[in-house]
Structures are given as C-alpha cells and as structure tokens.
C-alpha cells in the first residue's frame, strides 16, 4: 500500500510501536517512521493502567505530529500500535480508512470502523461483520508485486535449490510446534528440497542432518522462496495466505489455535473451501503427520496443479492500488 501511494506522488509516513517489527522494517523500505512507546492491555491492573497512560500520551503525540504533517488521509491496519494515530486523526477531522486483513475483525478495527470514512477488507465475509452502520468494501489483501512477477526458474537459481521444493514458513513470529515437527520430519535423506523459515525465536533450537533441508531464521526475499516451492506449509495469517495466492502454490495451512475468535481458522477456511489449500489442525501436527501430508501432495501432480490454480484465482493483485486510490481521492476532497 505504501509503495502504491508513493508511486502516485504521495509522501508516506508510518506511525508504529517502539518495540514492533516496524522499527526495523519500515526504514529499510525507505519510509519515515514515528515510533511510539506503547504497551498492550494484557496483564494485571497495574499493567493495564500503564498501557492506558501510554496510549493517552501517544494520542497527544500523534495529534501534534498530524498537525505538523497535515496528511490528506490516515490508514489504520489494526492492532494497538495503529490506534493512537487513528484516534488523533478522528479528533482532527482527517479522513480515516481502516484495512482489515482477517476474516474476523480485531477489536481496534471494530472500534475504529465506526467513525472511519470507509473500512476496506481482505476477505469478502469480513465486511458484514462490521455491521450495517459501517461503510465497508472488499478490496482484497495488498501484496507486494514481487510475488506476482517472480519467475520460478530465477527463484530456483538464486536460492540454489533443486526441485521439488517444500517451503515451511510459520510467519514472522514463527510457530514452535510446526518448526519442531519439520526439523524432525525431514531428517536423513529426502528426494526433495526443504526450506524451513523458522523465525528468530525458534531458530537456535533447530537443526537437521539432511543436506537438502535448509533452516533459515528469516528470508527477506520470501517471494523467491514461495515461487520456488511446489508445496507450502504455512500458518493461517492473511498475509501469508495471500502471498501464496499471488504465486499460486498448493498449501497446507496450520492455523494458530489460540485466537479467541478462531481468526486464522476462518482465514484458512476461505481457501480450503475453494479447493486452494488443505487444513491441518495444530494439535495434529507431528513429524510423521507433517511428512505424510507433504509427500502425499508431492506425489499427486494433478491435485497440486488444481490447488495452485484455485489458489491463484483468489489473489487480489489490485488491492494496494484500490486502497491508494481511495485515500488519495479523500485527501483531494479534504474532509473527514
């Protein structure tokens, strides 16, 4: 979304948390970042009181910054880190948009959606979950264009991989159960390559004696890894699912099981019900099951092709442009 806005001549500035991944990723992408001291609302009364105080201070800080920056529009993408800027924009009458990535809206987006100019959703069903009083539209999930343009031959060459290729990716936060199962499942020799992207937290605990099993902490060029793969094992985060859809690959989805609203399970079902992915419940993940499911898909080329085609049909290549165009139009009008 930020790249689409910048290409249209807009200056893009991020507001985020001092402790979030954005502290590293946003400047690396060439965008300005105002990092705010924030804390989640988990914990006891003292922790919640501190979080509320930090939030109030962050709103005051955001209000001052927005007065200085004078943006045409503000976009909130959910989570407590986006809430102060959205609240400050509301107070100043700046047009505010919300993008909801998941099938089930989060608390911050539910609250912010009531006063947003428009709520833009990745999954069609999410629009109705905001209620009739909220103006919501399905635009899809903004996805980096590299996922749409990457070449498999180039990806295999760059990564030094021999097909077939299995990619195991737990998302930015990792996934311990999946990581441990994969490290065990693909030991010894395999007639296929395995790339396992573990995340920072789990990486020190993992190893493999399989020369075709590569374990990485992080992959900046994740689009090359998805493009190189024949089968992808992922969590049910919206970003990961739509990244795989952009490339068009058969996927085994292991939703994170501890969200109160089954957010990742519902995300995954959108794809599994359309024949684009298979569901593997988290509690069923072990080395034997994971390897069996992967090899079953690798051994059925026709099925993989059908799944890949269905997955690709669910991609939303114009989502970022849709968001950018709506924000720029609101900025030109200049009213909240």
UniProtKB/Swiss-Prot annotation:
TM spans (from-to): none
InterPro entries: GlcNAc_MurG (IPR006009), Glyco_trans_28_C (IPR007235), GlycoTrans_28_N (IPR004276)
Catalysed reaction, written as an equation: di-trans,octa-cis-undecaprenyl diphospho-N-acetyl-alpha-D-muramoyl-L-alanyl-D-glutamyl-meso-2,6-diaminopimeloyl-D-alanyl-D-alanine + UDP-N-acetyl-alpha-D-glucosamine = di-trans,octa-cis-undecaprenyl diphospho-[N-acetyl-alpha-D-glucosaminyl-(1->4)]-N-acetyl-alpha-D-muramoyl-L-alanyl-D-glutamyl-meso-2,6-diaminopimeloyl-D-alanyl-D-alanine + UDP + H(+)
Entry's localization field: Cell membrane
UniProt keyword annotations, A-Z: Cell cycle, Cell division, Cell membrane, Cell shape, Cell wall biogenesis/degradation, Glycosyltransferase, Membrane, Peptidoglycan synthesis, Transferase
Membrane topology field: Peripheral membrane protein
EC assignment: 2.4.1.227
GO cellular component: plasma membrane
Example of a GO biological process term: cell division
Keyword field contains Transmembrane helix: no
Residue positions binding UDP-N-acetyl-alpha-D-glucosamine: 102, 144, 172, 264
Recorded superkingdom: Bacteria
Uppermost EC category: transferase
Pathway where this protein functions: Cell wall biogenesis; peptidoglycan biosynthesis
Protein name: UDP-N-acetylglucosamine--N-acetylmuramyl-(pentapeptide) pyrophosphoryl-undecaprenol N-acetylglucosamine transferase
Species in which this protein is naturally found: Rubrobacter xylanophilus (strain DSM 9941 / JCM 11954 / NBRC 16129 / PRD-1)
Organism taxonomic ancestry: Bacteria, Bacillati, Actinomycetota, Rubrobacteria, Rubrobacterales
């Amino acid at each position: 979304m930020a790249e689409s806005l910048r290409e249209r001549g807009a200056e893009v500035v991020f507001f985020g948390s001092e402790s979030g991944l954005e502290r590293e990723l946003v400047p690396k992408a060439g965008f300005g970042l105002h990092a705010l001291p924030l804390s989640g609302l988990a914990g006891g009364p003292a922790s919640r009181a501190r979080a509320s105080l930090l939030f109030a201070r962050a709103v005051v800080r955001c209000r001052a910054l927005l007065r200085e920056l004078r943006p045409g529009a503000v976009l909130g993408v959910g989570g407590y880190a986006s809430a102060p800027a959205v609240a400050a924009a509301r107070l100043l009458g700046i047009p505010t948009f919300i993008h909801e990535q998941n099938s089930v809206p989060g608390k911050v987006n539910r609250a912010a959606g009531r006063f947003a100019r428009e709520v833009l959703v990745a999954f069609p069903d999410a629009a109705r979950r905001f209620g009739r009083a909220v103006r919501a539209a399905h635009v899809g999930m903004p996805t980096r264009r590299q996922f749409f343009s990457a070449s498999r031959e180039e990806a295999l060459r760059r990564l030094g991989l021999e097909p077939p290729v299995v990619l195991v990716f737990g998302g930015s936060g990792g996934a311990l159960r999946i990581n441990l199962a994969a490290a065990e499942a693909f030991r010894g020799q395999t007639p296929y390559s395995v790339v396992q992207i573990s995340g920072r937290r789990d990486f020190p605990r993992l190893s493999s004696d399989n020369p075709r099993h590569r374990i990485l902490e992080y992959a900046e060029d994740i689009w090359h890894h998805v493009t190189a793969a024949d089968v992808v094992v992922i969590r049910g985060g919206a970003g990961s699912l739509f990244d795989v859809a952009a490339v068009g690959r058969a996927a085994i989805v292991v939703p994170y099981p501890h969200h109160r609203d089954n957010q990742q399970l519902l995300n995954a079902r959108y794809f599994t019900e359309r024949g684009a992915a298979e569901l593997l419940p988290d509690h069923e993940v072990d080395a034997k099951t994971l390897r069996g499911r992967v090899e079953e898909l690798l051994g059925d080329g026709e099925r993989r092709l059908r799944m890949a085609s269905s997955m690709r049909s669910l991609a939303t290549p114009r989502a970022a442009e849709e968001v950018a165009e709506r924000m720029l139009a609101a900025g030109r009008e200049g009213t909240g």
